Structures are given as structure tokens and as C-alpha cells.
């Protein structure tokens, strides 16, 4: 303790942008995306939904939303969290097909995701598993950005950010890509 001293600690280890390239998102088309998965470990679980929107000048240009058949029953905790059921996934395309479609749809556009490390880990795992090439898109992580800009907030969950920033929020749909 140093009495009479005010100290600010800044965590310079926060990764906000992965595979950084020069982009100005204000005048560039970019993709906001999210994934839903069978669990929390990219090595043993897989994606069951990829959802995304292409945005330019704050306008949605296009949407991508595909469910994926994991060919195994979902854990109840995932159904409870996402409201995605086995019946909804049965007969949908496989993870390799949907991942390839998504990557083709994105092209070389920069990506934005909340808690991007999670989504990136599943994208990288799918690319490796299905020989789709290296996943090296530029990705901006809004959760890391919020941690850096607002370290005093109680947490940096999407629900907290939307409330603090006065952004409309649908509690029932937040765990759907």
C-alpha cells in the first residue's frame, strides 16, 4: 500500500484484434458473427449454428444463418442455453459444408464477435478438421474492447454492455447465433 498515491493498472495483454490488418470499420463492409456449439471445447465439440450479418454504414446488407447437424444428441445444458433442439438440427447440413459456405460468404471481410476467442477456436478447429485452409481472418473482439475501455464495469457480458450502452436487448434470443 502506498498511502497518498493513486495508481491505475492497465492490462496491455488484452487481445482486441486478432490477425490485425488495416481496416476502418466506419467505411468498410464487415461481418458480425456468432456461433453456437455442442459444448465449450473446440477440440471435442462442434458448431451447431453460425449466424452473421454483413454491415456497411450501420446498415445490414446480408444475413447468414445456418443450423448444423452434429449427428449426436445435444447435451441438455446446451438446449437449455440456446433453445436449439435435436429436432431442429436433424437433417441439416454437416459442419464442414456450413463452415465452407460461411467462409465463402465472408470472403476477406473483417469479422466482429463478442468473446471472439471462443468463436475463433471453433472456426480454426473446423478449418483444420475439414482441410478448409487456415482460418486467419481479422477479428475484432467486442468483449476484449469493452474490458479495455471499461475496466470498472462489473462484467463484460453482452447483456451488460447493451444495458450500459442503451442498446436494445432481447433476453430470450441472446444465446442464438
Regions found by a protein language model. Give the residues of each.
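Phosphodiester-processing cores and adjacent nucleic acid-binding clamps
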Residues: 1-33, 54, 116, 133-139, ...
Amino acid at each position: 500500500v502506498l498511502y497518498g498515491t493513486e495508481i491505475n493498472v492497465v492490462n496491455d495483454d488484452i487481445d482486441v484484434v486478432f490477425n490485425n490488418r488495416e481496416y476502418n470499420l466506419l467505411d468498410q463492409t464487415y461481418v458480425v458473427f456468432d456461433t453456437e456449439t455442442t459444448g465449450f471445447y473446440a477440440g471435442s465439440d462442434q458448431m451447431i449454428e453460425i449466424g452473421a450479418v454483413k454491415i456497411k454504414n450501420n446498415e445490414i446488407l446480408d444475413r447468414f444463418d445456418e443450423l448444423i447437424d452434429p449427428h449426436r444428441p445435444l447435451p441438455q445444458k446446451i438446449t437449455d442455453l440456446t433453445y436449439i433442439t435435436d429436432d431442429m438440427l436433424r437433417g441439416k447440413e454437416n459442419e464442414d459444408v456450413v463452415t465452407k459456405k460461411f467462409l465463402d460468404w465472408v470472403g476477406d471481410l473483417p469479422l466482429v464477435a463478442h468473446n471472439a476467442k471462443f468463436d475463433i477456436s471453433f472456426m480454426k478447429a473446423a478449418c483444420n478438421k475439414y482441410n478448409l485452409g487456415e482460418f486467419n481472418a481479422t477479428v475484432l473482439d467486442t468483449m476484449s474492447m469493452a474490458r479495455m475501455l471499461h475496466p470498472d464495469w462489473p462484467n463484460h457480458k453482452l447483456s451488460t454492455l447493451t444495458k450500459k450502452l442503451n442498446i436494445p436487448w432481447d433476453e430470450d434470443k441472446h444465446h442464438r447465433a
